[in-house]
Every structure is written in C-alpha cells, then in structure tokens.
Amino acid sequence: MKREYQDGGGSGGGGDEMGSSRDKMMVSSSEAGEGEEVDELLAALGYKVRASDMADVAQKLEQLEMAMGMGGPAPDDGFATHLATDTVHYNPTDLSSWVESMLSELNAPPPPLPPAPPQLNASTSSTVTGGGGYFDLPPSVDSSSSTYALRPIISPPVAPADLSADSVRDPKRMRTGGSSTSSSSSSSSSLGGGAARSSVVEAAPPVAAAAAAPALPVVVVDTQEAGIRLVHALLACAEAVQQENLSAAEALVKQIPLLAASQGGAMRKVAAYFGEALARRVFRFRPQPDSSLLDAAFADLLHAHFYESCPYLKFAHFTANQAILEAFAGCRRVHVVDFGIKQGMQWPALLQALALRPGGPPSFRLTGVGPPQPDETDALQQVGWKLAQFAHTIRVDFQYRGLVAATLADLEPFMLQPEGEEDPNEEPEVIAVNSVFEMHRLLAQPGALEKVLGTVRAVRPRIVTVVEQEANHNSGSFLDRFTESLHYYSTMFDSLEGGSSGGPSEVSSGGAAPAAAAGTDQVMSEVYLGRQICNVVACEGTERTERHETLGQWRNRLGNAGFETVHLGSNAYKQASTLLALFAGGDGYKVEEKEGCLTLGWHTRPLIATSAWRLAAP
C-alpha cells in the first residue's frame, strides 16, 4: 500500500506537530514516476530506488555508514541522539532523497585519506553483478568471514601511484556467489533463479593492504591468560551456586564455553564437562539415572572402553587379584564375592593364576552381584556362562551364582553362604570380598555402608579388597567439592591425553586400525568420566552417587567397622610397575606404596587406591 506525503512545513505544537511529523513520513503514489524502472526487490520492501540511481544510492549509504561511526573507530553518540530527537526526515521510502537528507543533517566532511605507501599501489575494487543493477563497493578486508567467504588474491607490486578514494574507503562486507576472478584467474557460478553473480578482487600485497586499510582493532588471545580466566570463571560460578546467587551463576555459566573455546587438549574438554554440569545445576536440568536397556548397555560400553584406554581398571583388578591370590594360598575351596561384577573382566586372570598354582587349582566359586536389567534379562547369568567356559578350558572346577540387587544394602549374610548343607569332612570355604569403585555409592544413603560392612563381617571373609578413587568428592561444601573434583578430573584427563600417543603394543602392531581404536577408546573414556563429573556437580541427595573419598577416610570408616589393614606385598608393587610399562605415557604413571596400600597416579597426583582388609582381632 502506498503512503501519502504531505509537506507540513510548519512547526506547530502539541498534536498538530505530531500529526505533521507523521505526514512527513508519508509518500504519494504519484511520486513513483509512472514509466520509470524501479528495483523490484527494494520496492517489495517499501523503498523506491530507480535502477539508474542504484550506484549513487550505494555510495551514499556507504558514506552515511562511515559518518555515523559504523565503519570508523567509534560511533558518534551525539549524532545518534540528535537523529533520535530533533531531526525530521522526509519521505524515507524515497531511499536516495532520504540518505541525502541524512548526510545533510550530519554535514560531515569525508574521512581523511591515509598516506600512500612509497612504492606500492593498492588498487582494490569489487563488482557484484545482480539482477537489478551493479554495485561498485569496496572489497571486504575480512576474508576469513564464513558468511561471505571473500578470498583476496595477492597481486604483484606495481609502480607507485596515488591511492584513489575507493581504494582506501572503509571496508564493507559483501556477499559473493562463491566465485572469484582476478587479473590472472577467473571463474563463475550460477545460483538459484538463473541470476549469475561474480566478484572481481585485486588485493594488494599484505604490506600495502595494511597501509591502505584504516586501523582496525586487533584482538590477541593469550591462551595462558584465557586459561586462567576460564578457571576463575568456573570457580566463581561454583561460588555463586553455593551462595544461591543464580543470576550471577547464569551469567558466568554462559561465559565458560566462550573461554573454553580458546583452550586445547585436556583443559578444553574438562571445562566443557564442568560447564555442562554447572549449567544443569543452574537451570535445574538434572541428568536422569540409567533406566532403559539402551542406557545400561551404553554404561557397560563406556566401562569397557575405559578399561582398554588407560591402566586404572587394570591396575585395580591386578592388585586386588594379587591380594586375593596370596590370601588363597594353600586353600582347596575358595569363594569370591564380587560386589560389582560388570562384564567379569577381572576374573579370567585370577582363574589362570590359580590354574598354574603348584599342587593344582582349587575349587573356585564366584558370586557376582549386579543391578537389575531394565528388560529383566539375566545379564549376570550370561557373564557366568562365559567365565564357566573359560574355566573349563583351563581345567578349573568352577561354580557361579548371580545375585541381582538394586543396591548392596539389600544383601543379607545368608545370600552369600554356600548353597545347601556343607560336608563336615570337607575343608570349609575361604571367602574373599571384592569391591572395585562400588563402596562410595553407598554413602548416598545414610546407614547403607554400615549395613553392608556388617553383612561382610557376618560371612567372616579372609580378605576384603577395596579399590576407590583417591579424591574427596563428598564434602558438604559445594565449592570445596567442586574445586577438588576440578583438580582431580583435570589430572585424569591429562593422563588420557598423555597416554593417547600409542604404547609399545600399539606401535608394534602398526597400521591405522590400532590408532583409530585407541582414539575411540579415549573419546569414550572421556564420556565415561564426564558422566561422573555431571553427577558430582549437578546432582544432590540420593541422586549424587559419585561420593568419592580419600584413602584416609576409608581407613577410618573400615577401622570403625571392625576391620584392619592387610599390607599389600612388595611383589604386587613390582608387578604393578611392570604392568604400567605396557601403556603409552608409562613414565607419567606413578605407583606408590602408602601405609600398606598401593596408589596409582599421574605424575605427582594419586588417582586411585587399592587397599586390603581383614577382620580385626577381638
């Protein structure tokens, strides 16, 4: 619909002045100029621009933009205020007249030209051909723009000459059709609707381009400084969460991804997982527990990849098995209760060691405890079948029983006793209880750990092996817990990065397949650890199950429950050190003996700890 234009001319007050101003914004349909060719695209937007005026309008728009400060170093706030209050602009639909009136209001001289370089000529031009006419605009200096993808082509230096106004005009962004031509090369492309677009760019050498272009702000990103700011942002956000200052926490959590993008390697990944966990806590989008068959299968898959990618689980299994093997010395009937059997990866090595024992292997019974499956299948029984087949091949008398329990606190002593009546003439079973990364989950429910330790004490095991993360992620203070977990998982991710270069076994096998498999293992291991981070940071109450504690804290808990430490022998220490030589980055992994327990860490930071326990003397 065309708008009517009336020249009020006067400066009346009150409602008359407002009506006059509104009238000045109207345009008469008779002014369109019947018979004149008007650009259809601009006309559809409500602007009248004759095809013959396109180049002139473009140049005036550019001058207006520079005058308003958009292309210069800083905008003119006074001019913007002036435009918003006192100025009356006539007929904005007549784009040419409107731009001219805006320029006349400003009445600013053209921008000064920078001095010409002594021996270089920067002749730059760009032409975009469209359906409505030709625009002669300066080229875009920002050739890295993903929106416009303008790629300047370097031309050889020529004889010195004065710079034209076009060559030094502030750069403008320009959309091209993906084609570029120069004095030495040309190409063309066709876009939708049959409209062909082409661009011609003749760029000066870098020195000349720098001299010709106006000074633009340059942002130099200091990776180390950005890393410090990233850590400060993470800690400040955690402090805001603890103080329940959600507005500050929300503002900080939005900065974390931007700061993390400047980092590389382990720091970027750790920051991404902690940033996600903070965002979930701030916006109350807590992670849901694994409740479907797919979730359970995915958790098992992550556990398997973590086992393959780094030595932590292998170290846990090896040191626990060594303690159990020494406790079973000379016994003919042995029984192992595994509080978290998973895929049963720990037990083939122990079965093989027992099979090679002088005097022959003992009768081996295994009780595997695991959570119920969402589809109610007996996954524990499938693990038992595989272990039974392996035991048969190495000629070990093997019995297996699976116990499904939603939590270890549901176990009762009678469930762990031998089935049926024991033969009084036979040697009694020697029991070992094994827990790898399971005890800390009991701390989510008050009294659950004490209940389980009471059950263990009732079956009177000869040895109890416990492997836990060497960290304190169970503090009552959220900020303390967050800070400790940030340090812990940063070291854990560093160890994954350090061990990703390929160990001796991978190098000897050669080929791209082992490297690809190692890369997959590392990525899935990072997801495995990321889920722990999310639980530590984003969850509370019974949902927060990753309540890791230090070896000293476990020593107090087990000591109060009636257990005492069994010193792990020097043989376990030596063999564990030998095991680490098989892994890439083995020089970074450190095994330490601490008060009869063994810890595995990365450089100077212990990450997991293995301890062995027995019933204390009455």
UniProtKB/Swiss-Prot annotation:
Spans annotated as PFYRE: 431-535
UniProt-annotated stretches for the region Disordered: 1-36, 106-137, 159-197
GO biological process: gibberellic acid mediated signaling pathway
Extent of Low complexity compositional bias: 119-128, 176-197
Record's GO cellular component terms: nucleus
Region (SAW): 538-614
Top-rank lineage group of the source organism: Eukaryota
Pfam families per UniProt: DELLA, GRAS
Motif (LxCxE motif) on chain: 235-239
Tissue distribution of the protein: Apparently restricted to regions where growth is occurring in the leaf blade. Localizes almost exclusively to the basal elongation zone (EZ) for the elongating blades of L1, L2 and L3. More detailed fractionation of the L3 blade shows that in cv. Himalaya, it is preferentially localized to the basal third of the EZ, but its presence can still be detected toward the end of the EZ (at protein level).
Motif segment (DELLA motif): 39-43
Pro residues bias spans: 108-118
Chain positions covered by the region annotation VHIID: 303-368
Residue ranges the record marks as coiled coil: none
Biased composition regions of type Gly residues, renumbered to the chain: 7-17
Motif VHIID per record, residues: 334-338
Gene3D superfamilies the record matches: Transcriptional regulator DELLA, N-terminal domain (1.10.10.1290)
Region (Leucine repeat I (LRI)): 228-284
Keywords from the UniProt entry: Gibberellin signaling pathway, Nucleus, Phosphoprotein, Repressor, Transcription, Transcription regulation, Ubl conjugation
InterPro entries cross-referenced by the UniProt entry: DELLA_N_sf, TF_DELLA_N, TF_GRAS
UniProt-annotated location(s): Nucleus
Function comment: Probable transcriptional regulator that acts as a repressor of the gibberellin (GA) signaling pathway. Probably acts by participating in large multiprotein complexes that repress transcription of GA-inducible genes. Upon GA application, it is degraded by the proteasome, allowing the GA signaling pathway. Acts as a negative regulator of GAMYB gene expression.
Domain remark in the UniProt entry: The DELLA motif is required for its GA-induced degradation.
Family: Belongs to the GRAS family. DELLA subfamily.
Name of the protein this chain belongs to: DELLA protein SLN1
Species of provenance: Hordeum vulgare
